[in-house]
Amino acid sequence: MAVKVEYDLKRLRNIGIAAHIDAGKTTTTERILYYTGRIHKIGEVHEGAATMDFMEQERERGITITAAVTTCFWKDHRINIIDTPGHVDFTIEVERSMRVLDGAIVVFDSSQGVEPQSETVWRQAEKYHVPRIAFANKMDKTGADLWLVIRTMQERLGARPVVMQLPIGREDTFSGIIDVLRMKAYTYGNDLGTDIREIPIPEEYLDQAREYHEKLVEVAADFDEHIMLKYLEGEEPTEEELVAAIRKGTIDLKITPVFLGSALKNKGVQLLLDAVVDYLPSPLDIPPIKGTTPEGEVVEIHPDPNGPLAALAFKIMADPYVGRLTFIRVYSGTLTSGSYVYNTTKGRKERVARLLRMHANHREEVEELKAGDLGAVVGLKETITGDTLVGEDAPRVILESIEVPEPVIDVAIEPKTKADQEKLSQALARLAEEDPTFRVSTHPETGQTIISGMGELHLEIIVDRLKREFKVDANVGKPQVAYRETITKPVDVEGKFIRQTGGRGQYGHVKIKVEPLPRGSGFEFVNAIVGGVIPKEYIPAVQKGIEEAMQSGPLIGFPVVDIKVTLYDGSYHEVDSSEMAFKIAGSMAIKEAVQKGDPVILEPIMRVEVTTPEEYMGDVIGDLNARRGQILGMEPRGNAQVIRAFVPLAEMFGYATDLRSKTQGRGSFVMFFDHYQEVPKQVQEKLIKGQ
């Protein structure tokens, strides 16, 4: 039975939990779901009187959230947790999660401080202007040190951390937490962490607590003149005033409040949930999203449940029980189950069969999702990641889509057994539907299945999923760069296909002019035939012949791009002409034209951003130059340097390993496809020789 929910945007939090791989993201997430699930059991929130009996399952299999978004409750607030991946090859995954969340918890391992991968996650959150709070986890571990976390946040991230809590005890004697804003202390009476006791701050911690309370008031005064006046007059601001000021500083991206605990030992998680409610933004606190009308006008879309419907699809998942799930965020209006929506990206109408909300271990059917909320839709067939959905009669806006970079690396794949061929094709089609940066095609000459993706790791994971989820074992070739070919001068050619010996003959004759186009233009076909010298029913056949022949260029067999073909003359035979004959004539003509047009090879050029500590900068730049890179510029970010460059993809294989050794594991990089450009002469000769 679908459940209706009382709705208040102020009480909604859409957050991500981001971390270095081993900082304890999963455990933190599990514990959050456990405590919020307990509330369901106690029955304070009557949404569907859901019972989440977690501990049993946790013991059995250590839950890890796989849903793209999981919903839970805390203190009358709904919290949607959006899963964020930890790895850079999945920039699309991170982009897609950063696009739909409003705030984040960044988890650090207290014994390690800020690790290289946490730097990457942090920079991504910065790029999307996501307000965040930090959780210093594993405070019970040997070597745990809150001050290491604070120091490395300042040094490596250039952040302004604000100490919100102090630990009672350290490492294995860690037993409680001091809240320096409210000047209270909490200890735990049991291992589950459910028995929290408020106690006076222990004598030996009082001075330190007062010192940090004072510092907190100073920070708050930066964001609130009223507190500033009180502070100058020696008056104590109220708890509400302090919370409001720290909230404002966090949402304005000026400060990062730091909390602490041990998720594994169930300490500090409820206080972290309080912090999500207190300091992270609701959909009303963030700037409105922008959309574009069909006329190209940019409009702002405000989170109003009574406004026109506008939603963004941010992930597709195949679910064993209900089929294809489309995860969406509603930015405006209300989406109701059973309604029709219009996909403005595709120009298609779709029906919403059912709406689901994912809890950690069950799904709940709901009647509607309102502005600001996230959930999953069952029944959409055409919609993919980055598409915009609007109401049937709502204005046809398109939301800024999630940028989907072009795949740049190709690998040939075949099933280990012939019997698996059909299974492999179906599995690849399913995976391509889920992940817009993954493509499947057939090589025009060898007939091999080619899979294309964003990087080596990306394709390794796809192959791994084939085995695990679809039970298909596959052999894969070596990764190849997706080259292209084109011409550099205009040419005029004719193609004749004439066979006239006994019986019905073949007759097709065309004259074409072929010209180079600017990079990225693709293919343009112009029909300039006048006076019916070629009957119009044969024109599409000529175009088809040309397009098919362009799949394999004369130099190294890669597709030909960026040309304009004008069909301007030719002739036909009353009896012997056929579509087939004109198709062959077209293909003969274009093959000759490309040969004569001084063909060149184009290679994908990547926009590479390397983040490295200052001291390794010289080495990193030297290495990029050696890889035929073109340095575009540098900028400090925190106290690292970001180097931007264009580098040919062919030179980037194995770069992750090289960069790690050059920067002792502290450098990180992201790369996106930017454009194709002509390869240098000596590289072209090498490629042709290597054929």
Curated annotation (Swiss-Prot):
Main subcellular location: cytoplasm
SMART domains: EFG_C, EFG_IV
A Gene Ontology molecular function term of the record: GTP binding
Keywords from the named record: Cytoplasm, Elongation factor, GTP-binding, Nucleotide-binding, Protein biosynthesis
SUPFAM superfamilies on file: EF-G C-terminal domain-like, P-loop containing nucleoside triphosphate hydrolases, Ribosomal protein S5 domain 2-like, Translation proteins
Family in the record: Belongs to the TRAFAC class translation factor GTPase superfamily. Classic translation factor GTPase family. EF-G/EF-2 subfamily.
Protein name (database record): Elongation factor G
Species of origin: Thermus thermophilus (strain ATCC BAA-163 / DSM 7039 / HB27)
Lineage: Bacteria, Thermotogati, Deinococcota, Deinococci, Thermales
